[in-house]
């Protein structure tokens, strides 16, 4: 397995697909990286030479913010929103959808599993 940006890249996959295993690199950015390095996107990772792997590693580390740095950057931005007390920050703090989605129904992913609420007790049957 090739190791790029602290991630083990799967050997059997095409390079274009394998690069997307790195947080911060999607399909379009993977294609862009391969074009700039001149590596064939249809090659399997196991077919890459050491020179090509080091070329990919240098390209990614120099030009892109990936993995831990990117996660840290995102967390800092969310923390900043919470600190200034804007609506987006409050929604993050409360664990609710941030981008204006409805919450009367749906929003289960963001709000978590359903909480069981006790129903009204039925009136005792008259005898």
Curated annotation (Swiss-Prot):
Keywords: Ribonucleoprotein, Ribosomal protein, RNA-binding, rRNA-binding, tRNA-binding. The keyword Lipoprotein does not apply. It holds the Pfam family Ribosomal_S13. Residues 101-127 have a biased composition (Basic residues). It comes from the Bacteria. One of its GO terms (biological process) is translation. One of its GO terms (cellular component) is small ribosomal subunit. Located at the top of the head of the 30S subunit, it contacts several helices of the 16S rRNA. In the 70S ribosome it contacts the 23S rRNA (bridge B1a) and protein L5 of the 50S subunit (bridge B1b), connecting the 2 subunits; these bridges are implicated in subunit movement. Contacts the tRNAs in the A and P-sites. PANTHER family: 30S RIBOSOMAL PROTEIN S13/40S RIBOSOMAL PROTEIN S18, SMALL RIBOSOMAL SUBUNIT PROTEIN US13M. Part of the 30S ribosomal subunit. Forms a loose heterodimer with protein S19. Forms two bridges to the 50S subunit in the 70S ribosome. NCBIfam families: uS13_bact. This is Small ribosomal subunit protein uS13. It comes from Gloeobacter violaceus (strain ATCC 29082 / PCC 7421). The gene is rpsM.
